[in-house]
Structure formats: C-alpha cells, structure tokens
C-alpha cells in the first residue's frame, strides 16, 4: 500500500494541473474622434503642464501624498492630444534623457518652444457599489461597480500667461454582475475602472478641445 502513495500523489498533481487554463486576447484601445482624420489647419506647438487631482478621492489625511491620479491623467492627456492630429505635442517630461541621447550622438539639441501649455485638473472622481435584489434575494441579486470622473483642461498662452481656452470632459464606467438562485457571475473590486473612466473623461475633453479649434472658437497660432 505504501508503494501506491507516490503513484496516487503523482496522479493527483497531474489532475490538478490539468484544471489550469490560460488565455489571452488583445483589446482595442479607444481613441479620440479626430484620430486619423484629414486636417490642413495650424498645428500649434503645445506642451502639457501640471495635471492635479483636485477631487476628494485619495486626498484625505491617510493619503500617501503621491498624486497617482494626476500622474496617470497627464500620461493619458499627452497620448490623446498627439493622436488628435491637431497639435504639435512637445515632451517636457524626459528632458534629461533627450539631452543625454543627443550628447551621445554628438549633436546639439534644437528644442522647439511651445506657444501654449495645457494644464489639467481632475475636479471630480468617485466610486460606488450599488446593489439590488428581487423577491428578497430569492430570485436573484446584483451588484454594480460605478466610477465617475470629470476633468478640466486650460490652454495657457506661454507669452502672456492668459488662459485662452477651457474645456471639460466627464465620463462614467460601470461593471455589473448578477446572481440568480445561487448561480451566476461574481466580480470583486476592479481597480482598472479608475483608469478606464479617467481615460474616458480626458478623451471627451480633448474631443471638445478639437471641436473648439475646428469651429473657430479657439484659433491657435503656430
């Protein structure tokens, strides 16, 4: 009987390993409305300034002092501004790295100056979980995670410090699951909703910024 233990153990391990599944897929990334559309107007040189979290989210006495939401928002904004095809977006975050590479190459940098600085603020951000049940939960119950974000973008003239144009964008993202008679999907806390709703709000703000340019409400200079 003792000789059977190693065999049974090996079979058990193989059976458990056979239950493990692995899968992957690519997900299409949403882009601004003007992405890959024709444009013959002025592409004003702009840089992205500070993007701060002005909401109450992660700004309490127990926060670590690192503006993770603002840093994430700035990265998203740079990407959407560039993909809009309406601006010449200048990088000011990796200045030392760019200077190092130019030095290694033996070339002198010829930095381009920005006519405008785009600053941003997360003015509203929040998450909540709402639930419902049918016939006291006997016929089913559900849970929905909801994330909401609102951002403001200000375009500042670098020569005069005048705020020449302002736009806002807001978005809401939700994740739902429902269980009926003990059967159904269950979903834990999804931290990716923060990034998704932030991307949605900033994308809407950039769409509004592009609309302002194309409608003539803001006429950027080159």
Spans of model-derived segments:
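A generic structural signal for short, non-catalytic loop/turn and secondary-structure boundary residues
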Residues: 9, 39-41, 82, 115-118, ...
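Soluble periplasmic/extracytoplasmic beta-strand elements of cell-envelope proteins
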Residues: 45-52, 76-80, 88-90, 115-123, ...
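A structural "domain/chain start" motif
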Residues: 19-90, 94-102, 175, 181-187, ...
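Bacterial Sec-type N-terminal signal peptides, specifically the leucine/valine-rich hydrophobic h-region
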Residues: 13-16
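Short beta-strand edge segments in extracellular beta-sheet folds
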Residues: 170-172
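Bacterial N-terminal signal peptides that target proteins for export
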Residues: 1-8
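Interfaces that engage single-stranded nucleic acids at replication/repair/recombination sites
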Residues: 8-10, 204
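Surface-exposed short loop/turn segments
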Residues: 21-25, 97-164, 174-177, 183-188
């Amino acid at each position: 009987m003792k000789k059977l233990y190693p065999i049974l153990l090996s079979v058990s391990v193989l059976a458990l390993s056979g239950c493990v599944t692995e899968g992957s897929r690519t997900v299409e990334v949403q882009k601004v409305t003007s992405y890959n559309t024709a444009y013959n107007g002025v592409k004003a040189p702009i840089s992205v300034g500070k993007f701060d979290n002005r909401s109450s989210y992660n700004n309490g006495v127990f926060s670590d002092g690192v503006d993770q939401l603002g840093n994430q928002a700035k990265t998203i904004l740079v990407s959407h501004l560039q993909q809009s095809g309406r601006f010449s977006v200048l990088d000011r975050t990796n200045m030392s790295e760019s200077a190092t590479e130019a030095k290694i190459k033996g070339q002198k940098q010829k930095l381009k100056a920005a006519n405008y600085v785009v600053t941003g603020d997360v003015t509203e951000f929040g998450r909540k979980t709402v639930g419902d049940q049918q016939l006291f939960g006997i016929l089913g119950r559900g849970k929905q995670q909801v994330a909401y974000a609102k951002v403001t973008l200000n375009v500042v003239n670098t020569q005069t410090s005048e705020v020449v144009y302002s736009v806002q964008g807001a978005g809401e993202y939700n994740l739902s699951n429902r269980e009926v008679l003990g059967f159904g999907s269950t979903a834990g806390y999804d931290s990716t909703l923060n990034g998704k709703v932030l991307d949605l709000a900033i994308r809407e703000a950039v769409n509004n910024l592009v609309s302002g340019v194309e409608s003539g409400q803001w006429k950027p200079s080159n």
